[in-house]
């Protein structure tokens, strides 16, 4: 089977974003609550869309002839994305 030489028309990116953390446990020592914080997260994928409200990436793709299919799509509220780093392809 011959490999297609289709060039992906999307840039590879690393998304740095903030996520909530929650805990269902009870705290007797409130200093533990004072130290409770959100999480910093990173995802790598291809930038599908960036608007003032959302950023959408995907991390899997396939070509069937010239038809592109994508998978593993993630959509982030723009307010939680703190940095977009464009990776070398």
Language model: regions and residue ranges:
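Conserved RNA-binding domains used in RNP assembly and mRNA/RNA metabolism
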Residues: 2-89
């Amino acid at each position: 089977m011959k490999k297609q030489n289709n060039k992906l028309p999307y840039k590879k990116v690393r998304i740095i974003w903030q996520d909530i953390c929650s805990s269902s446990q009870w705290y007797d020592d409130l200093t533990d609550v004072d130290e409770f914080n959100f999480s910093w997260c990173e995802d790598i994928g291809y930038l599908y869309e960036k608007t003032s409200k959302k950023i959408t990436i995907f991390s899997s793709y396939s070509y069937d002839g010239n038809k592109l299919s994508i998978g593993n799509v993630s959509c982030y509220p723009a307010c939680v994305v703190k940095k977009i780093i464009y990776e070398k392809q």
